Curated annotation (Swiss-Prot):
Residues that, per the record, bind Ca(2+) 1: 19, 22, 24, 27, 32
Protein's organism: Homo sapiens
Protein name (Swiss-Prot/TrEMBL): Protein S100-A12
GO CC entries: cytoplasm; cytoskeleton; cytosol; extracellular region; nucleus; plasma membrane; secretory granule lumen
Lipid bilayer topology: Peripheral membrane protein
Record bears the keyword Membrane: yes
Subcellular location(s) per record: Secreted; Cytoplasm; Cytoplasm, Cytoskeleton; Cell membrane
Pfam families: S_100 (PF01023)
Length: 92
Protein backbone atom coordinates (compact mmCIF):
# COMPACT_ATOMS: atom_id res chain seq x y z
CA UNK A 1 0.00 0.00 0.00
CA UNK A 2 1.31 3.47 -0.83
CA UNK A 3 1.77 6.15 1.80
CA UNK A 4 -1.26 8.07 0.52
CA UNK A 5 -3.39 4.92 0.54
CA UNK A 6 -2.31 4.25 4.13
CA UNK A 7 -3.33 7.77 5.14
CA UNK A 8 -6.69 7.43 3.38
CA UNK A 9 -7.32 4.13 5.15
CA UNK A 10 -6.35 5.85 8.40
CA UNK A 11 -9.03 8.50 7.86
CA UNK A 12 -11.64 5.79 7.30
CA UNK A 13 -10.45 3.92 10.39
CA UNK A 14 -10.61 7.04 12.57
CA UNK A 15 -14.16 7.73 11.36
CA UNK A 16 -15.23 4.18 12.24
CA UNK A 17 -13.42 4.26 15.59
CA UNK A 18 -15.87 6.98 16.65
CA UNK A 19 -18.96 6.13 14.56
CA UNK A 20 -19.52 2.72 16.15
CA UNK A 21 -19.93 4.10 19.68
CA UNK A 22 -23.55 5.27 19.58
CA UNK A 23 -26.53 4.89 17.27
CA UNK A 24 -25.93 3.80 13.69
CA UNK A 25 -22.49 2.23 13.26
CA UNK A 26 -21.66 4.26 10.14
CA UNK A 27 -22.63 7.78 11.26
CA UNK A 28 -21.36 10.19 13.89
CA UNK A 29 -23.68 11.60 16.51
CA UNK A 30 -22.96 15.09 17.80
CA UNK A 31 -21.19 13.59 20.82
CA UNK A 32 -19.10 11.25 18.69
CA UNK A 33 -18.10 14.14 16.41
CA UNK A 34 -17.12 16.24 19.42
CA UNK A 35 -14.95 13.40 20.75
CA UNK A 36 -13.35 12.93 17.35
CA UNK A 37 -12.64 16.66 17.00
CA UNK A 38 -11.20 17.07 20.48
CA UNK A 39 -9.02 13.94 20.33
CA UNK A 40 -8.04 13.62 16.67
CA UNK A 41 -7.93 17.29 15.63
CA UNK A 42 -6.88 18.70 18.99
CA UNK A 43 -4.21 21.01 17.58
CA UNK A 44 -6.43 22.18 14.74
CA UNK A 45 -9.29 23.22 17.04
CA UNK A 46 -7.28 24.12 20.15
CA UNK A 47 -8.69 27.66 20.20
CA UNK A 48 -12.31 26.49 20.07
CA UNK A 49 -13.61 26.37 23.63
CA UNK A 50 -17.22 27.34 23.00
CA UNK A 51 -19.71 24.44 22.79
CA UNK A 52 -21.77 26.54 20.37
CA UNK A 53 -18.94 26.41 17.83
CA UNK A 54 -18.93 22.59 17.94
CA UNK A 55 -22.71 22.69 17.43
CA UNK A 56 -22.22 25.00 14.42
CA UNK A 57 -19.62 22.65 12.95
CA UNK A 58 -22.02 19.73 13.40
CA UNK A 59 -24.91 21.61 11.79
CA UNK A 60 -22.69 22.70 8.92
CA UNK A 61 -21.58 19.13 8.24
CA UNK A 62 -25.06 17.60 8.62
CA UNK A 63 -26.11 18.46 5.06
CA UNK A 64 -29.28 16.33 5.10
CA UNK A 65 -30.20 17.51 8.62
CA UNK A 66 -30.75 14.03 10.03
CA UNK A 67 -28.83 14.83 13.24
CA UNK A 68 -26.04 12.45 12.16
CA UNK A 69 -22.84 13.02 10.18
CA UNK A 70 -22.26 10.26 7.65
CA UNK A 71 -18.92 9.55 5.98
CA UNK A 72 -19.66 11.74 2.96
CA UNK A 73 -20.48 14.66 5.26
CA UNK A 74 -17.40 13.92 7.38
CA UNK A 75 -15.17 14.18 4.31
CA UNK A 76 -16.16 17.87 4.08
CA UNK A 77 -14.50 18.38 7.46
CA UNK A 78 -11.43 16.43 6.36
CA UNK A 79 -11.13 18.62 3.24
CA UNK A 80 -11.30 21.79 5.34
CA UNK A 81 -8.68 20.44 7.76
CA UNK A 82 -6.42 19.47 4.85
CA UNK A 83 -6.71 22.95 3.33
CA UNK A 84 -5.80 24.50 6.67
CA UNK A 85 -2.83 22.16 7.08
CA UNK A 86 -1.65 22.95 3.55
CA UNK A 87 -1.95 26.68 4.18
CA UNK A 88 -0.11 26.33 7.48
CA UNK A 89 2.85 24.55 5.84
CA UNK A 90 3.37 27.54 3.55
CA UNK A 91 3.30 30.00 6.45
CA UNK A 92 6.14 28.34 8.35
Amino acid sequence: MTKLEEHLEGIVNIFHQYSVRKGHFDTLSKGELKQLLTKELANTIKNIKDKAVIDEIFQGLDANQDEQVDFQEFISLVAIALKAAHYHTHKE
